[in-house]
Amino acid sequence: MTTRILTGITPTGTPHLGNYAGAIRPAILASRRSDVDSFYFLADYHALIKCDDPARIQRSRLEIAATWLAGGLDVERATFYRQSDIPEIPELTWLLTCVSAKGLLNRAHAYKAAVDRNVEAGEDPDAGVTMGLYSYPVLMAADILMFNAHKIPVGRDQVQHVEMARDIGQRFNHLFGNGREFFVLPEAVIEENVATLPGLDGRKMSKSYDNTIPLFSPSRQLKDAIARIVTDSRAPGEPKDPDSSHLFLLYSAFASAEQVAAFRQELLEGLAWGEAKQRLFQLLDNELGEARERYQALIAKPDDIEDILLAGAAKARRIATPFIAELREAVGLRSLREPLKSAESGKKKAAKAARLVSFRDDDGSFRFRLLDAAGEQLLLSRAFADGKAAGAVSKRLLAGETADLRAEGNAFGLWLDGEAVAQSPAFADAAARDAAIERTREALAPQE
């Protein structure tokens, strides 16, 4: 079976070593597998949320596209495109927006972080929050669901967005599928073994921290950047600790196992930091030299890159165009020449719309949510160590097994076999809590 994998990179700056080692290089390697169908795109609509400098976005799109190509991406095997060249994506975004619960989007980490910063500063909670930031998860859901990707390689900070895409896709399927599952529910793949590289100051390499090492900078600039890497004060001849060295982590991300072992031993034997930085420079200059030449040649011919991206968009639209037509048909955006269909024939009753949604939390544990017909959360399960345990509880609830709902202040808990397995959010008052308990009982009642 072929697995479809989808990855996007937001073009808001010059690609750096962290982008390459953490996302681009592993994606290119994965695209060469015969059992993988790869979709890689420049998330330039997402870039507009973070950047209001048109020249920077234009330049970054060119640089990131050239980086993928210089890194060895085979555009005959993979589908490589710009998000903004697929008009079906914003259309799908709107269709999904219309079934996305506000309560779901309120829980998005980026939005909550912005609100928390504003509250801490004594400002209006939504000060500076754009609808682009707020609805970012819906656009990401459209990116994923448009091509029915099975697996989405992400960092831990993006797992929630993939889970939200699952929720939104499941909601659309329920409302408009009429027996058909339009959307595959994607799975977040946390790449535990993919490098998260430190920057010049030891923090995660990020444009936000201004601590990056540009991927394809000329040799002189690369050497100067490496010279600025922060190290401890241990003198030449004094043993160094490789495992606490940012420089060693950078070296390890690009060296062979034999080179890493030799470098580790040299540090333990007291290799001077200046010499260690020279070793890192030589390694990177050798490893990236040929790709740097390809990159510079590509940058000099933007028309060629444009042609490649447009060809990739045409390839992607061969999937997107007929699919969006099916989705338009499903929601009722049909030709007036077609016979009218009754609302009951294409839609399930709202009373049956409550659902259990399983997901993997940021800490790696497994949970499930009970959502009502409007997508509002009624219950959040406790953390389970493995998916089978969480699934077993979900299965019992779906089978209509009687659960004990216990009021706890303005919230309530769900108990099975004398054990608390899920908890509600806090409600405004006891009346709201009791109404939610009744909705929960109805949601968990066996459907005839």
Swiss-Prot record:
Positions annotated to bind L-tryptophan: D143
Compartment annotation: Cytoplasm
PROSITE patterns noted in UniProt: AA_TRNA_LIGASE_I
Keyword Ligase among record annotations: yes
Cited CDD domains: TrpRS_core
Example of a GO cellular component annotation carried by this entry: cytosol
Motif, 'KMSKS' region: chain positions: 204-208
Domain of life of the source: Bacteria
NCBIfam families from the UniProt entry: PRK12284.1, trpS
Function of the protein: Catalyzes the attachment of tryptophan to tRNA(Trp).
Keywords recorded for this protein, A-Z: Aminoacyl-tRNA synthetase, ATP-binding, Cytoplasm, Ligase, Nucleotide-binding, Protein biosynthesis
Gene name per UniProt: trpS
Placement of sequence motif 'HIGH' region: 11-19
MF annotations from Gene Ontology: ATP binding; tryptophan-tRNA ligase activity
Main location: cytoplasm
Substrates-to-products reaction catalysed: tRNA(Trp) + L-tryptophan + ATP = L-tryptophyl-tRNA(Trp) + AMP + diphosphate + H(+)
Binding-site positions, ATP: T10, P11, T12, G18, N19, G155, R156, D157, L197, K204, M205, S206, K207, S208
Annotated organism of origin: Pseudomonas aeruginosa (strain ATCC 15692 / DSM 22644 / CIP 104116 / JCM 14847 / LMG 12228 / 1C / PRS 101 / PAO1)
PANTHER family: TRYPTOPHAN--TRNA LIGASE, MITOCHONDRIAL
Protein name per Swiss-Prot or TrEMBL: Tryptophan--tRNA ligase
Enzyme Commission number(s) from the entry: 6.1.1.2
GO process annotations (BP): tryptophanyl-tRNA aminoacylation
Subunit structure: Homodimer.
Homology family: Belongs to the class-I aminoacyl-tRNA synthetase family.
